[in-house]
Regions:
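Phosphate- and other anionic-substrate recognition elements at nucleic-acid/protein interfaces
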Residues: 1-158
């Protein structure tokens, strides 16, 4: 059984965890020009994400619920990224479940609080559990997508 974990957003990551292999990668993105002023926006490259996920042949995917803050300039990109991920999963015919970050963070990272502390704890745990991916994890800055997959494949017993 192959489980995919997705840390939603253009700065996120995704991982596929199978019994005998693991894959971790930053979210594929592209820059687009939007509107009359041609403002540059970073978007998930949905066709590439679809190809990557399809190639992993996952049994199920778990993706983190997008940021639901009060600032429009953060909510809209998060929703746009979330929609792209959903489309990629649906086109690949991968069943998915949207989960709250606390579902996996609390059991794996404990009582760590604060965004920067959580990123650091995620990176350290990811490097400890998957030393063969330490370079990629460190370069990305956290292992959230990998830890989501790890939690649902190995801890929660899915």
């Amino acid at each position: 059984m192959t489980i995919v974990g997705i840390d939603n957003g253009t700065s996120g990551s995704w991982a596929a965890l199978a019994p005998d292999w693991v894959y971790f990668h930053r979210m594929p993105t592209k820059v687009s020009l939007l509107g009359k002023k041609e403002r540059r926006i970073t978007r998930i490259d949905m066709p590439i994400l679809h190809e990557q996920i399809y190639a992993a042949k996952p049994s199920k995917a778990y993706l983190e619920r997008p940021f639901t803050g009060r600032f429009l300039n953060a909510v809209l990109p998060a929703q746009r990224a979330f929609e792209a991920v959903l489309i990629a999963l649906e086109q690949a015919r991968v069943p998915y479940e949207v989960v709250d970050s606390k579902t996996w963070q609390k059991p794996l990272l404990g009582a760590v609080k604060g965004s920067e502390n959580l990123k650091k704890a995620s990176m350290e745990l990811g490097c400890r559990l998957y030393p063969e991916l330490a370079y990629q994890i460190t370069k990305h800055g956290d292992a959230d997508g990998l830890l989501i997959a790890h939690y649902f494949a190995r801890v929660a017993g899915q």
